[in-house]
A protein has these predicted regions:
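Binding-site signature for planar aromatic cofactors or substrates
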Residues: 1-145
Length: 145
């Protein structure tokens, strides 16, 4: 991934992730916890109760659409379930690492893209605290080298 895309994903972002179901149909879902671990790896917190994790178990090929201010990238790669049960999310999630094999800039010359954002309803601000610890777990421990 180019450096500016890695930098964008280092802090954690929301992305659209596509998996392949048992009938070989693409299935998309919005994943709120996506982090770049390094230029070749993106990690995801994937709900263990949903279809995406079942799909990844059967077919590890995934696509990720990254949308942000002046960013529009398509990533393709192979997913590996690194941890069946993450400790930090408020609901059951697996930690999935994706080895990025293809990066495509989907931006268009002369077009300014303003990325998606979200906010919390009144009384739900505590969810921002969950995000902080989930993103930290997805980043993993600091390198030992």
């Amino acid at each position: 991934m180019p450096p500016h895309l890695v930098q964008f994903l280092l802090g954690g972002q929301t992305c659209v992730v596509a998996t392949v179901d048992e009938h070989r149909w693409p299935t998309t879902t919005l994943m709120t916890w996506v982090v770049a671990r390094n230029p070749q790896t993106v990690t995801l917190a994937v709900d263990t109760r949903g279809k995406s994790l079942r799909n990844i178990r059967k077919n590890a090929h995934v696509a990720i659409e990254v949308l942000g201010d002046d960013l529009c990238y398509g990533l393709r790669g192979v997913a590996v379930i690194e941890k069946e049960e993450m400790q930090s999310p408020p609901f059951p999630c697996a930690l999935v690492a994706v080895r990025i094999e293809d990066v495509r800039d989907h931006g268009a010359a002369g077009v300014k893209f303003v990325g998606p954002t979200y906010s919390y309803e009144t009384g739900k601000e505590h969810r921002a605290g969950f995000e902080k610890v989930v993103f930290a777990e997805l980043k993993g421990p600091p390198p030992t080298i």
